[in-house]
Amino acid sequence: MSAKSENKQSVKALEELLKHLTVCDAAEEADAAKALASFVNGPIEEQDAPSQVFSAISKQLNDKNATARERVLKGLEAVANHGSVAADVEPYLVELLPAVIAKVADKQNAVRDAAIAASKAIVRCTTPYAVKAIVPSVLESIHTTGKWNEKMNSLQLLDVLVEVAPSQLSYSLPQIIPVVSESMWDTKAEVKKQSKETMTKVCTLIANADIDRFIPELINCIAHPEEVPETIHSLGATTFVTEVQAPTLSIMVPLLARGLNERSTPIKRKTAVIIDNMSKLVEDPQVVAPFLPKLLPGLYHIKDTIGDPECRSVVQRAITTLERVGNVVDGKIPEVSTAANPEVCLETLKAVLGEIKVPTNEEVIAKYVANIAAQLVEEKDNENESWVLNITPYLTAFIDEAHIHKIVEQLRTRSIAKIPGGASHAEEEEEGEDLCNCEFSLAYGAKILLNRTRLRLKRGRRYGLCGPNGSGKSTLMRAIVNGQVEGFPTHLRTVYVEHDIDESEADTPSVDFILQDPAVPIKDRDEIVKALKENSFTDELINMPIGSLSGGWKMKLALTRAMFKNPDILLLDEPTNHLDVVNVAWLENFLVNQKDVSSIIVSHDSGFLDHVVQAIIHYERFKLRKYLGNMSEFVKKVPSAKSYYELGASEMEFKFPEPGFLEGVKTKQRAIIKVQHMSFQYPGTSKPQLNDISFQVSLSSRIAVIGPNGAGKSTLIKVLTGELLPTVGEIYQHENCRIAYVAQAAFTHLGHHPDKTPSEYIQWRFQSGEDLEAMDKASRVISEADEEAMKNKIFKIEGTQRKILGIHSRRKLKNSYEYECSFLVGENIGMKSERWVPMMSSDNAWLPRGELMETHAKMVAEVDRAEALKSGQFRPLVRKEIEEHCSLLGLDAELVSHSRIKGLSGGQKVKLVLAACTWLRPHVIVLDEPTNYLDRDSLGALSKGLKNFGGGVVLVTHSREFTEGLTEEVWAVNNGHMTPSGHNWVSGQGSGPRIQEKEEGDTFDAFGNKIEKAKKAKKLTGAELRKKKKERMARRKAGLEVSDDEL
């Protein structure tokens, strides 16, 4: 039988089935509809058969007979609900959707119900990538129809699309939200209710953690404009950190446009702040382009008319940011790209087809393919696999399969080429056995970290995981090991190696720590001991409680335990933290030799990554992008990531305040801290941790403290800063010297103030002029031994024996100071009736500093601190001053004054700690392992800031990269002894350039009160004195009154 005759038979069969559905009894209706659906979706020889039957269906939809209209709608529902809708049928169903939606307004209830069911069935059966073919007709119905029941159904169709095509529909939110917003003002109560429900559902597609909790308020503002000011206030206190995409702007811009039109100046200012903050997080100019006409005119108008200069400056900042992000030049808003328009994609498809002419009756399928291609372009999907999978089935309806692959490839490349800025990064191919190849999304709490990204790992490969602080590197590794990554193979053994070990196991010996782990299959103690010894553990370390191990040994222990679990993938989070150079080299060698175990490594040590990794997995706009090669190769491909590789490449730079003037210190070489023959031993230990150590620190010091793990570096620093007191030895510290100390546990203090803003925290911490967080230092707390020493010290003054009751003030005495003391006078000393009676304040006496330091050093230090307060070397504790100080360390003013500490990222908290520690303008900054808690950008900024700091710097670090070019002096600590090198210690002032005491501007006490200073009288020259004498003699000769002391 010929194809032509087969075609005639197919058409005739379809016509008979359709006719039977129209005239059959109600009992046969379901079977007739099912028969029609099976035939239409079955194999029909010539593809023009569906076009003819759907043409007949279209005519019958307008039949005068209500039963005929109802039956054909039910037939359409059956076709759409068929188990496998044919690819050449689907486009025709969508083509009929507007006509089906219109029938929802039919006067006959049965027809209306059939139309509702058919329209929903059609929307459900289509591919998710065809939303551009469906959404326009649905929105047109909502916008133009005067029939409330049709509008209700169209709103419900949007609800269906949220269920079946959520990610694809999110790209259409800028078109959907304005139309649904308009229907929320409908006069029909049912429509208003349905509109609000639909708006709530479509807003669930907005993947932005910053505004998630405000979405109900944003929706409420559409129906209740009077709520706009309060919502603006709520949003104004929000820190925006998540990348802003079109869905976010689609719900935010209507509110912001209204905010700009509010009468209140504070609301206009807050609106401009929100626009500025959100715009900074827009990466693609095409994302913001459609919204520029709604925001820029309002901002321009406010700038030209507002009277408040501060508000005007904020508005100008928002305009500058919007114009930069949107590529606005000379006020001209750029055109929105048409690359993702279905009409453009249809033209591209026809051009690609070339000589293969699209049959007139298959134009429907061609348009449908163009809509799918437009969606792929909208998503910037450049993966060939996606285009082949989503387009090929529909082209086979009218194109020979031999040509399809070439046509799809040409359509993809030409369509993607029209995207401004090009497509997203195409991942480089990697050889080897696949361990995993999965697509997933990841969130932390309400914050989205990764969105529909792909992770592909090969066996035996080493990957570096790179991204800024807060991007979710550690969260991803925890999600992998906890089985929370969708699609990740469950049979793979993944082990997360952390640098911290649970405190609950602090008393467990090292060997038992491995033995007691249920995930370790080997229970042979000798084998575990052998493995530990191979990793340099001694017998003492093997049996030592892990709480007594240094950080480096804990890391090696955790890694040894991990290998006993026979892992497929090792997840290492900052493995070089606390490791000295020797152990870092050991770790590099260890990882490189693991041929069957893959590794994912997070590290700030770029040199380590350069030696170890074979590929970099980089966080880019909520995606993971893989780049083959080590760290240096990665930087060549992504120059913007240069700060990961070179600290000096960081664009940020911290600026530390200039230290205050120190009385008697005339050069930067003079020692302001000096330690001689100091030893320290923790109570209960068998030997001292530090032995016979001497050093000095000056304003010009740039010191690196290095040494193996457990050598005593942190203990030395704690003695230096007063956290610990030496067991033996002398420590001199200039009376007014201030030290800023940032320990490894840098966030400890912040955890007690989660609900304060950074500004409020600094105001609380320095409310009395002193640092309240430093009140518990050992150098300030009076111990029982101190009390006993003070109690037993008797001074003989004016023939009486006295004990010091208090030390109140200080004054200059030659090259030192003397202190005013109040006393207890002794009566009947040495007898049973001995007692000590407080003396009157008139009996106070001044004692030299040298006499007091032996027993009353801590009381003397308190007076020194109080005198430093009176000297006016402290700034006013007001918001503006705090904002200016924090801005030097990379914290924005809005963040400092309007964000709570608990909402800050890890990097922002470190900057706050640095800002708080340096508030009192320290003379020495001491940092313990700064590379452990700062990302690469911040480390580069810190390095630059420390280079230019006017005081001394002491660093404890294993990172040679960080100290190179920064430090000149090295303290090598090993086995309790310290060997200095590169030092230039001097006695006295030294021979360096003299420090000139700067003429200070206004100075303030700790409470912000201005300190008035008496102006110094100018000393007259000899010529001026002689001239004055002549004038005085002339006045006396003239009989005028002249004062004897007049000059």
Curated annotation (Swiss-Prot):
Pathway noted in the entry: Protein biosynthesis; polypeptide chain elongation
EC number: 3.6.4.-
Domain ABC transporter: 411-647, 673-1000
Main location (coarse class): cytoplasm
UniProt KW keywords: ATP-binding, Cytoplasm, Elongation factor, Hydrolase, Nucleotide-binding, Phosphoprotein, Protein biosynthesis, Repeat, RNA-binding
Residues holding ADP: 396, 401, 709, 929, 932, 958
Region (Disordered): 1022-1047
Record InterPro entries: AAA+_ATPase, ABC_transporter-like_ATP-bd, ABC_transporter-like_CS, ABCF_EF3_subfamily, ARM-like, ARM-type_fold, eEF3_ABC2_chromodomain-like, eEF3_chromodomain-like_sf
Enzyme class: hydrolase
A biological process from GO: cytoplasmic translational elongation
Phylogenetic classification of the source organism: Eukaryota, Fungi, Dikarya, Ascomycota, Taphrinomycotina
Localization in the cell: Cytoplasm, Cytosol
Source organism (scientific name): Schizosaccharomyces pombe (strain 972 / ATCC 24843) (Fission yeast)
A single cellular component GO annotation: cytosol
Subunit structure: Monomer.
UniProt entry tagged with the keyword Transmembrane: no
Functional description taken from the UniProt entry: Ribosome-dependent ATPase that functions in cytoplasmic translation elongation. Required for the ATP-dependent release of deacylated tRNA from the ribosomal E-site during protein biosynthesis. Stimulates the eEF1A-dependent binding of aminoacyl-tRNA to the ribosomal A-site, which has reduced affinity for tRNA as long as the E-site is occupied. Assists translation termination by stimulating the release of nascent protein from the ribosome by release factors.
Domain of life of the organism encoding this protein: Eukaryota
Protein known as: Elongation factor 3
Repeat (HEAT) residue spans along the chain: 48-85, 91-128, 130-167, 171-208, 210-246, 247-284
